[in-house]
């Protein structure tokens, strides 16, 4: 007897990926808020019922808090734009979260470089 794998995780991944691509385009082309600068969408996590989506973003320059506030204020506008593009029954409510991974990586690299340089001086 063959067991059937659930397609839900794969579909959820596809929906998250499509939301990420469409949101990136909407933010770049249609969002006119000056607080939103060079935003990179890192990932999108959608709840199993597609009611909510956490959208993780990073910035090249700018104030992360102001950008997060601007994106969350524009969430309804962006969700409406997704309605026109996505062919799913429920378009999730968007929640934008600043992703500090790149900052942490830069801090770790700086600490490693400092440790290596201080070790070189001791020898």
Swiss-Prot record:
Superkingdom as given in the UniProt entry: Bacteria
A Pfam family recorded for this sequence: RBFA
Family: Belongs to the RbfA family.
Annotated NCBIfam families: rbfA (TIGR00082)
Organism name: Delftia acidovorans (strain DSM 14801 / SPH-1)
Major subcellular location class: cytoplasm
Key words of the record: Cytoplasm, Ribosome biogenesis
GO molecular function: ribosomal small subunit binding
InterPro entries given in the database record: KH_dom-like_a/b, RbfA, RbfA_dom_sf
HAMAP family registered for this protein in UniProt: RbfA
Record flagged with keyword Glycoprotein: no
Oligomeric form and interacting partners: Monomer. Binds 30S ribosomal subunits, but not 50S ribosomal subunits or 70S ribosomes.
Function statement: One of several proteins that assist in the late maturation steps of the functional core of the 30S ribosomal subunit. Associates with free 30S ribosomal subunits (but not with 30S subunits that are part of 70S ribosomes or polysomes). Required for efficient processing of 16S rRNA. May interact with the 5'-terminal helix region of 16S rRNA.
Identification of the protein by name: Ribosome-binding factor A
Subcellular location: Cytoplasm
BP GO annotations: maturation of SSU-rRNA
Gene Ontology cellular component terms for the protein in this record: cytosol
